[in-house]
């Protein structure tokens, strides 16, 4: 039997080839080299308030559900819709044509933690037959915090009596990601650094938030192959906000800045394109986002798409 020995040069070549292959795989993560293609017209705006922000979308069976922040009279400049602060929802048979359904999460009663406004609903997570929807809330005496509501049908929601469950400074824009039996709740913290806490059951969360070293608001996290990709919003939601992309191969390792997310900006989003959600729809990623072109007087929901690379088919 012959024994072959690898020279140092050959070993170096193999190592470099492996590194190159890994980097090529990482590059295929959405938002790194691929460009999102946004439709030229919005797909939705609340018919009652002419205002829709922070969309979160889930498909169950043949129905799509969109939850969003509606009517925020506190918005700087006096804009913010026509009604009372709340989280509304709409449904769709195809993810494109939406029908308004009503209020999902109303503003809290006087003295409650969300009596000023509920906002930024996270995508509902199903556990043991119950959907959990985390969202941010605020009253006049406290900074933004995070609580949740539950539902069995995605239509009628009951607020958790122990809200808020996360209240360590500024806690906004929750996003929940499940990986290997652990729930990661990503959220914006004071200074706009994106951090996360973990939970085994969606109820009890780790006491000390972990920094991702990514900066922004309204974070979204998806796993594409072996790469975790985070999208974070940079700027102000009514004046020039955009998405920045970050990646990591391990959630225990800080995310690396991948540059500005590549997406065409339609006319209705010339002022700001941000705070959205991504779903996997057959062979495409669908990216729902909030958009404005008039300084925040009106927010609408847009949709961008991107074909999935062979890596994740």
What are these regions (language model features)?
Residues 1-10:
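Bacterial N-terminal signal peptides that target proteins for export
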Residues 20-313:
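Carbohydrate-active catalytic/glycan-binding domains of CAZyme proteins
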């Amino acid at each position: 039997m012959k024994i072959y020995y690898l020279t140092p040069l050959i070993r170096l070549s193999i190592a470099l080839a492996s590194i190159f292959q890994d980097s090529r795989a990482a590059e295929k993560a959405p938002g790194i080299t691929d460009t999102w293609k946004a439709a030229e017209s919005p797909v939705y705006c609340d018919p009652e308030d002419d205002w829709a922000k922070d969309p979160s979308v889930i498909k169950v069976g043949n129905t799509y559900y969109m939850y969003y922040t509606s009517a925020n009279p506190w918005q700087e400049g006096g804009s913010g819709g026509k009604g009372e602060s709340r989280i509304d929802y709409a449904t769709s048979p195809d993810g494109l044509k939406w029908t308004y359904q009503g209020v999902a999460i109303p503003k809290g009663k006087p003295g409650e933690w969300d009596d000023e406004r509920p906002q930024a609903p996270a995508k509902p997570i199903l556990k043991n037959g119950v959907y959990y929807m985390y969202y941010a809330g605020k009253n006049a005496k406290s900074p933004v915090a995070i609580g949740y509501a539950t539902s069995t049908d995605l239509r009628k929601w009951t607020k958790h009596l122990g809200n808020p469950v996360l209240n360590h400074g500024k806690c906004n824009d929750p996003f929940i990601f499940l990986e290997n039996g652990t729930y990661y709740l990503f959220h914006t913290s004071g200074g706009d650094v994106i951090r996360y806490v973990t939970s085994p059951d969606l109820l009890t969360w780790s006491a000390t938030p972990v920094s991702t070293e990514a900066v922004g608001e309204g974070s979204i996290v998806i796993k594409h192959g072996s790469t975790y990709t985070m999208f974070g919003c940079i700027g102000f939601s009514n004046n020039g906000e955009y998405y920045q992309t970050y990646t990591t191969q391990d959630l225990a390792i800080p995310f690396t800045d991948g540059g500005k997310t590549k997406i065409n900006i339609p006319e209705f989003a010339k002022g700001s394109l941000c705070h959205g959600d991504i779903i996997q729809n057959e062979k495409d990623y669908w990216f729902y986002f909030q958009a404005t072109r008039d300084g925040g007087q009106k927010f609408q929901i847009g949709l961008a798409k991107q074909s999935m690379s062979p890596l994740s088919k």
